[in-house]
């Protein structure tokens, strides 16, 4: 649909006139019969072809495929059909059928976990492992009632299952975030945590069934964050940047502190930083932060104050970011206020004619080929001369004040009143319009704003012509 053309031409003569008030129409609702005949187009979803599972660049990659028999660690006895890890030893024993290993051999750390699934089950904590065998080099003597031995075995199994689930979740999260991360330090931590659990089993820690339920619940919560403070040059992630602290302090795996010490050894939970972000790991500075970061409100897994570790491990300042954001927004608001929708106004300095006795704004036309063509817009001045004649001068309304017409009014100059607000004269133009015929008289038309101005100008020209 084309735009509506202007009904009235806007010029310098009618720019200050008020427009006629137009009545605004109303929209009418089409009837049902009209709507039935109209074609209504509806958007259709484009069929985007997805790449099949059998093709693609990663068709041969089967490392993260969930096995049909269930997820989790394949060598940790998750189900009845699970097979133990082959070739693993617990230090002193050579039995390959033992489902758990302390991974004392650090030459092949990646074989300690086997293959794992991305979406493995998280209910491994609640499963009870039927075998009461403990993975320790020195088996504790079975001196006591059978119920105490069974309770101790269940506690050990739940703690070990919680440790394995935490290791699995941590590896899956960080490998998905960055497949090139270095996983070597986590195996050393796993050995230390496993040795701590075996030490608790040797001490004969026991608890009631209610404490077992609380412990299983606490194992699913993230009480600590396994963070990093030093970014190595050859790997994206590092877990032991401060070696001096590792040698000076023995990191002991402690339980959640309660009122009595008997309950404290059974509420341990293993978590390798479920909530830590990869961007935080990548941006930590070296030497100023602690080796681990912990969540507030819970005691640290390594015997440190959680509040202090949280304050020391926060690499960013919330107040600083808020102040910077507020400053940038205020600067944007100030910039918007300074900018205005109005275009810059062009200031025109009019050239004054001090000795003129008559001045009037006009538009000058000249006749060529039986039609009038515009010469320009300016100010008409009538000035007396030394020869008792009157000078007619028209200067353009520009900063330069170019001369559009500069002639003397001779006695025989034709001067007539024509139209509504026009005065017609015939003269030899100066400056000349045609360089080839500079002395040829040309009909000039002077248009003023109102008819009264035209009458006044015509009267003055007739008076000065007769002088």
Swiss-Prot record:
There is a cross-link at residue 352 (Glycyl lysine isopeptide (Lys-Gly) (interchain with G-Cter in SUMO2)). Gene3D superfamilies: Pleckstrin-homology domain (PH domain)/Phosphotyrosine-binding domain (PTB) (2.30.29.30). Sequence repeats lie at residues 76-77, 113-114, 226-227, 272-273, 302-303. This is Nuclear pore complex protein Nup50. The keyword Ubl conjugation applies. Residues 89-103, 132-151, 226-236 have a biased composition (Polar residues). Component of the nuclear pore complex that has a direct role in nuclear protein import. Actively displaces NLSs from importin-alpha, and facilitates disassembly of the importin-alpha:beta-cargo complex and importin recycling. Interacts with regulatory proteins of cell cycle progression including CDKN1B. This interaction is required for correct intracellular transport and degradation of CDKN1B. Residues 1-20, 84-103, 129-151, 201-248, 313-348 are annotated as: Disordered. One of its GO terms (biological process) is neural tube formation. Residues 144-206 are annotated as: Binding to CDKN1B. Residues 76-303 are annotated as: 5 X 2 AA repeats of F-G. Contains FG repeats. FG repeats are interaction sites for karyopherins (importins, exportins) and form probably an affinity gradient, guiding the transport proteins unidirectionally with their cargo through the NPC. FG repeat regions are highly flexible and lack ordered secondary structure. The overall conservation of FG repeats regarding exact sequence, spacing, and repeat unit length is limited. CDD domains: RanBD_NUP50. The modification N6-acetyllysine is found at residues 8, 83, 127, 449. Pfam families: NUP50, Ran_BP1. GO terms for cellular component: nuclear envelope; nuclear membrane; nuclear pore. Does not interact with TPR. Interacts with Importin alpha-2, Importin beta, Importin beta-2, NUP153, Ran binding protein 7, CDKN1B and itself. SUPFAM superfamilies: PH domain-like (SSF50729). It is found in: Nucleus, Nuclear pore complex; Nucleus membrane. Highly expressed in testis, intermediate levels in kidney, liver, spleen and low basal levels in somatic cells. Expression in testis undergoes changes and subcellular localization during germ cell differentiation. It comes from the Eukaryota.
